[in-house]
UniProtKB/Swiss-Prot annotation:
Keywords: Cytoplasm, Hydrolase, Nuclease, Ribosome biogenesis
Source organism: Gloeothece citriformis (strain PCC 7424)
Role summary: Could be a nuclease involved in processing of the 5'-end of pre-16S rRNA.
One GO term of the biological process aspect: rRNA 5'-end processing
Name this polypeptide is given: Putative pre-16S rRNA nuclease
Entry's family note: Belongs to the YqgF nuclease family.
Main location: cytoplasm
GO MF term list: nuclease activity
InterPro entries: RNaseH-like_sf, YqgF, YqgF/RNaseH-like_dom, YqgF/RNaseH-like_dom_sf
């Protein structure tokens, strides 16, 4: 029997954090909510509720690399926030390269005729879903490679 996948995908911004979850099989990521950042302790309480409700085992955070592959100041701020959050929630933390996910999220929402410049939270949730989906797809690919190697 396959292990249940219980991950939260996060698109961390200065004002908001887009949050995504996935089905238990780890096939499909879906945007769940957007958390308006206030102060860190209040943010942690909001995340604790999600972690308990969904029995989360890992945080997957998008890391905004520069186009040349380096970590800029925004990426370092995301790392700092994510590290503190993972420690407060006592969860392991994994990163995914999130270059252009907000752009991709906007394009997906436009294609679905759901995009609005007034609803930034929707874009944040969609970006979080893209981040988590990348992580799920990478895990699945690695598992397939391991299976092929064992044949």
């Amino acid at each position: 029997m396959r292990e249940k996948i219980a991950a939260l995908g996060l698109d961390v911004g200065k004002k908001r954090v887009g949050v995504a979850g996935c089905d238990g099989l780890g096939l499909i990521a879906t945007g769940l909510t957007t958390i308006e950042r206030t102060h860190f302790i209040a943010d942690v309480e909001k995340f604790k509720q999600l972690v308990e409700e969904r029995d989360i085992k890992v945080l997957v955070v998008g890391l905004p690399y520069s186009m040349n592959g380096t970590l800029g100041s925004q990426a370092k701020q995301v790392q700092n926030y994510a590290t503190r959050l993972a420690k407060a929630l006592q969860l392991p933390l994994e990163y995914v390269d999130e270059r252009l996910t907000s752009y991709e999220a906007e394009e997906q929402l436009k294609a679905q005729k759901r995009f609005s410049t007034y609803n930034k939270g929707l874009v944040d949730r969609q970006a979080a879903a893209i981040i988590l989906q990348q992580w799920l797809d990478q895990r699945r690919s690695l598992r397939l490679i391991e299976l092929e190697d064992n044949l």
